């Protein structure tokens, strides 16, 4: 039997307002940090912010295809507000990631998300290098459709 109806990815680019999302979800301190993150991610990716799903502020996009054949689109870089924490999307581990993480400051790293409470706890130059490394690695892995 042929399975033609692929499951649709939940996280897709939308027309929702980035500013409205931040206004609704962020504390005052988080709002200031979001402003800095937005400038950093726009500078690194050379893309304007777009909402991806209901809760990710994403920049740029790339198309991926798994060995299973499932494919989709995702932002090259992004961030989200998760309660009292901010998270930055680092989809791909660049060559320098482990060394950079050791110099970053107070954070937790998940599979593809970097969690922290405030930018003041982090070395922002290192954070920018982490994002740039992840974006470069995504473009290297997906050269035919890197969203550039």
Q: What is each model feature region?
A:
Residues 1-148:
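Charge-dense, helix-prone N-terminal extensions
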């Amino acid at each position: 039997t042929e399975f033609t109806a692929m499951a649709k990815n939940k996280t897709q680019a939308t027309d929702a307002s980035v500013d409205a999302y931040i206004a609704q979800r962020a504390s005052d301190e988080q709002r200031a940090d979001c402003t800095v993150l937005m400038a950093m991610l726009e500078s690194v990716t050379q893309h304007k912010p777009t909402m991806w799903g209901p809760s990710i502020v994403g920049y740029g996009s790339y198309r991926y295809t798994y060995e299973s054949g499932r494919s989709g689109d995702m932002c090259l870089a992004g961030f989200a507000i998760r309660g009292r924490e901010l998270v930055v999307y680092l989809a791909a581990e660049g060559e320098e990631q482990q060394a950079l993480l050791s110099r970053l400051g107070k954070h937790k790293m998940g599979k593809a998300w970097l969690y922290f409470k405030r930018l003041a706890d982090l070395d922002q130059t290192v954070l920018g290098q982490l994002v740039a490394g992840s974006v470069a690695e995504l473009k290297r892995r997906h050269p035919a459709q890197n969203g550039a």
